[in-house]
């Protein structure tokens, strides 16, 4: 299993880092078999798996439950788990206790926090306490309630400079990596060159040290539409829907189960049942 020191070496050597989300045992198993470098148990599970319209309703228990399943499916892959909405915006002590609970109970190797500002101090304190932290800048889904959209971030000079400053701040605080989401590729390149820690892009161009995409987006499973930055590698929904419809039709038409799908008992044993009704 790769560790933070390996990710630092990959950045230094120019080897791209691959991260994929996973939310349960089978998806995690698939991701590990694909030899991805990292798994992100994102609070995006709220929208992708639980059917919420944002990540805000996701709880600590949700993250722990799903991370435990992921760990069983991918025991040899570095796992990062999101700290959900408002679990790191209270006191430092509350943040540390919440991170401790996630790491101890789920087995996650690191936690991910969105934003900068007051979050920078939380990253520093978590790092001091021995909890590896991945930062997340640019489009931060937990803040969409305030920003009102999932549009590209940091397109103006002022916003771009602020993001660079924030990236340097979370690096100084001890973050082991930074996810850069939905920012101009030129800015992502500048940030990547300015930092010694790896950058993982999602909608941030080719120049980041690595890439992350949502499992369901990659394979086309249960999604309504793909974002611009997502490349379609499969569309398994096109296979799933007819398969399920065929099953329903076979049952209705007495075409399933066939004899080969059934169990039998010896004829002499069957005869022994006669007259016992």
Curated annotation (Swiss-Prot):
Keywords: Cytoplasm, Magnesium, Metal-binding, Pantothenate biosynthesis, Transferase. Mg(2+) binds at residues 43, 82, 114. Binds 1 Mg(2+) ion per subunit. Its cofactor is Mg(2+). One of its GO terms (molecular function) is magnesium ion binding. Pathway: Cofactor biosynthesis; (R)-pantothenate biosynthesis; (R)-pantoate from 3-methyl-2-oxobutanoate: step 1/2. It is found in: Cytoplasm. This is 3-methyl-2-oxobutanoate hydroxymethyltransferase. It comes from Listeria innocua serovar 6a (strain ATCC BAA-680 / CLIP 11262). The gene is panB.
